[in-house]
Swiss-Prot record:
Keywords: Metal-binding, Ribonucleoprotein, Ribosomal protein, RNA-binding, rRNA-binding, Zinc, Zinc-finger. Its cofactor is Zn(2+). GO terms for cellular component: cytosolic large ribosomal subunit. One of its GO terms (biological process) is translation. It comes from the Eukaryota. A zinc finger (C4-type) spans 19-37. This is Large ribosomal subunit protein eL37. Gene3D superfamilies: 2.20.25.30. The keyword Zinc applies.
Length: 88
């Protein structure tokens, strides 16, 4: 049996399964870490050499249900809904 490409066809076991955090098939079974997002580390895995990957998962690629309204509220001084007292 050869060492290189022919022996790669003999592999059957999965080394990566689905990750609980990012959902990709990048969670290494033996290492117990995700190759994509770094789970179970507290902070998300990101590197400067992977600019495209950063662009895919950065702020603004999702719904931004809260953040998209912040700039407008900042412009108005974060009003609370209570009218200002009238000064005579």
């Amino acid at each position: 049996m050869s060492k290189g490409t022919p022996s790669l066809g003999k592999r059957h076991n999965k080394s990566h399964v689905l990750c609980n955090r990012c959902g990709k098939r990048s969670f290494h079974v033996q290492k117990k870490t995700c190759a994509s997002c770094g789970y179970p580390a507290a902070k998300l895995r990101s590197h400067n050499w992977a600019t495209k990957a950063k662009r895919r998962r950065t702020t603004g690629t999702g719904r931004m249900a809260y953040l998209k309204h912040v700039s407008r509220r900042f412009k108005n001084g974060f009003q609370t809904g209570v009218a200002k007292p009238q000064s005579a």
